[in-house]
C-alpha cells in the first residue's frame, strides 16, 4: 500500500486525521449544540473554524442531532438565500425525516411555490423562486423557510443545529434581514444556531451593538492559534504517517515562525 508523501492537507476542510486538535473547543461547542445554545464563532480566515464546526457536526449527528449548513457567501440576494435555505432544508433535514415522496410536502405552505429541478448527473434537487413576484412575497416566503427548522424539530422531537457560515454577509444581502431572522430564531428553542464569520468588526457590530436585533443573542467563542505543544504532536504524527520522521528542531523553528497559525504552519 502506498503511503502519502505530503503530511498535510491545506486549501480544503481539515477532516479526519487532517484535523488539528482543538478538542477543548470541539467539546465546548458540541455541548452548546446539544443544549440548543446559540453560538457565534469568531476567527480570522484560515484559522480552521469551518473544520472545527464540521468536526462538531459529525459528533452531533452521531448523537441524533440534525445539522443543516448554509454559507451566506454564496447567497448574494434574498432570492438566492431563499433558494439555498430550501435546498438545505430538503437535503439536510427533510431527507432524514421523511420518505422521498413526502419530502417536498414540507414546502407546501410557502407564499411562493418553489420551482424544483433535478440535476441529471447527480440527481440532486434544485430550488428556485419566481423573481418576478412582489418583493414582499419573497420576504414572506423566506421567513417561512426560516421557521421550518424549528417546526420540524418540534414536530419530530429532534434537536437541530443550523450553521450559518460567513454570517456577516447578511447585512449586505438585505439590511432588514437581521430583524426577520432574529424574530424567527428566538422562537426556536429546539434549534442551536451557530454563526461563523471571518470579519470580526462586522460580527461584533451584529452581536454586540445594543441597537442591533442580534444583540446578546448568542454565546461568543473565539478561535485562536494552536498551542505549540499541541501542534508539535500533530506534526510529528503526520510526518510519521508518511514514513519520513521530522527532526524536532525543524518543528520548533516552524512553530517559532508561524506562532501556531494553522494554515501557515501546514
Where do the model's predicted regions map?
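The conserved phosphate-sensing helix
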Residues: 258-266
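Helix-loop-helix "sensor" segment of P-loop NTPases
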Residues: 205-256
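Short, conserved phosphate/pyrophosphate- and ester-handling motifs at nucleotide-, phospho-/glycolipid
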Residues: 22, 50, 261
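Conserved Walker B catalytic segment
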Residues: 128-200, 208-210
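P-loop NTPase Walker A phosphate-binding motif
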Residues: 44-70
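AAA+/P-loop NTPase substrate/partner-engagement loops
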Residues: 62-84
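Conserved NTP-binding/hydrolysis module of P-loop NTPases
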Residues: 79-99, 113-124
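A short, basic N-terminal segment
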Residues: 1-39, 44, 99, 244
Amino acid at each position: 500500500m502506498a503511503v502519502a508523501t505530503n503530511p498535510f492537507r491545506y486549501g480544503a476542510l481539515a477532516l479526519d486525521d487532517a484535523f488539528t486538535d482543538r478538542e477543548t473547543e470541539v467539546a465546548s461547542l458540541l455541548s452548546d449544540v446539544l443544549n440548543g445554545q446559540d453560538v457565534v464563532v469568531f476567527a480570522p480566515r484560515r484559522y480552521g473554524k469551518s473544520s472545527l464546526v464540521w468536526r462538531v457536526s459529525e459528533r452531533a449527528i452521531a448523537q441524533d442531532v440534525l445539522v443543516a449548513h448554509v454559507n451566506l457567501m454564496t447567497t448574494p440576494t434574498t432570492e438566492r438565500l431563499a433558494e439555498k435555505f430550501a435546498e438545505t432544508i430538503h437535503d439536510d433535514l427533510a431527507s432524514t425525516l421523511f420518505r422521498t415522496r413526502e419530502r417536498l410536502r414540507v414546502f407546501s405552505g410557502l407564499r411562493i411555490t418553489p420551482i424544483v429541478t433535478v440535476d441529471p448527473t447527480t440527481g440532486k434537487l434544485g430550488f428556485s423562486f419566481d423573481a418576478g413576484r412582489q418583493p414582499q412575497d419573497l420576504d414572506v416566503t423566506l421567513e417561512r423557510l426560516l421557521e421550518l427548522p424549528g417546526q420540524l424539530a418540534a414536530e419530530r422531537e429532534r434537536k437541530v443545529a443550523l450553521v450559518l457560515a460567513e454570517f456577516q454577509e447578511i447585512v449586505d444581502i438585505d439590511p432588514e434581514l437581521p430583524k426577520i431572522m432574529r424574530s424567527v430564531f428566538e422562537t426556536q428553542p429546539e434549534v442551536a444556531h451557530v454563526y461563523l464569520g471571518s470579519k470580526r468588526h462586522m460580527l461584533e457590530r451584529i452581536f454586540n451593538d445594543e441597537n442591533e436585533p442580534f444583540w446578546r443573542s448568542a454565546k461568543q467563542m473565539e478561535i485562536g492559534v494552536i498551542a505549540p505543544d499541541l501542534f508539535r504532536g500533530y506534526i510529528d504524527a503526520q510526518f510519521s504517517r508518511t514514513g519520513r520522521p521530522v527532526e524536532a528542531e525543524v518543528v520548533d523553528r516552524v512553530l517559532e515562525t508561524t506562532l501556531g497559525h494553522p494554515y501557515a504552519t501546514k
